[in-house]
């Protein structure tokens, strides 16, 4: 994402600060679950100490990662620096319980699922609001006549409200698809190496997922299956196509020879450095252009489904860009 096309609320979800805060919470919840379980040696007092002292800084994590070339190890190392800072030399370090029995994928995939739900909640609210606006405008223009066109040629009369009505229904379908994708994506997995729970009790997964508002994966490997992420990206692609269709109609209606409708043009806005009379549909054009990115990223999501055996990381770099 680039700041020009990113709203602050959405951008904040994908900032390292937010990701590491989610990582921290997952690790703290896992410690509390282990203490509740009482099998590995961590006490509730240990878990409380860890929660009270755990912290990180993005700069320090980045500094450590430059050496380790492993983001999770860098994060855990920085957390341990805070957790153990007040422990006298020679005493056992509480940080030894952090990440106990977990893999990097247990942490990263569960956190990514949570980030996806955060992002989809914003998108769903916007799609719902836009659909309701289109519905309201459909009734507002239910008696406004306009020309219906097929193949771009005048066909029969219709009412302008029909356009808004069709958009409202399309957005309702988009909302349904996105909600279904959210439910599929809201899944966590803390199942240890290759997903066998050999190093961690399933109770930890259940505990963490419940606290995070996620559903435990009924059978993961060492990673969450990427068909979940692909469904999200495909739902976003269809939604983007719907928005592109609406924006394209606006662009066509704003043509100088048609001028049936136009997007707002605020005071002080300029349309051209050479032709001051121009009022261009730049917002609609931007929607059409950015829709191409979303649709292309859906292919990335589909390609990420096929991984080697119980995991590889061929999906990781692609997701850092596409998601």
PLM segments and residue spans:
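Hydrophobic side chains within alpha-helical segments
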Residues: 28, 109-112, 252, 260, ...
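Buried hydrophobic packing segments
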Residues: 30-31, 116, 120, 236, ...
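Long, amphipathic alpha-helical stalk/connector segments used for oligomerization, subunit docking
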Residues: 293-323
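A helix-coil-helix interface module used to build multimeric assemblies
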Residues: 1-191, 197, 202-207, 216, ...
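Short amphipathic alpha-helical interaction/hinge segments
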Residues: 142-145, 254, 258, 302
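Amphipathic, well-packed alpha-helical segments that form the structural scaffold of globular domains
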Residues: 135, 139, 209, 213, ...
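A glycine-rich phosphate-binding loop feature that marks nucleotide/adenosyl-phosphate handling sites
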Residues: 191-195, 264-269, 315-318
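Acidic, glycine-rich loop-and-beta core segments that form the ion-binding/anion-interacting portion
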Residues: 205-298
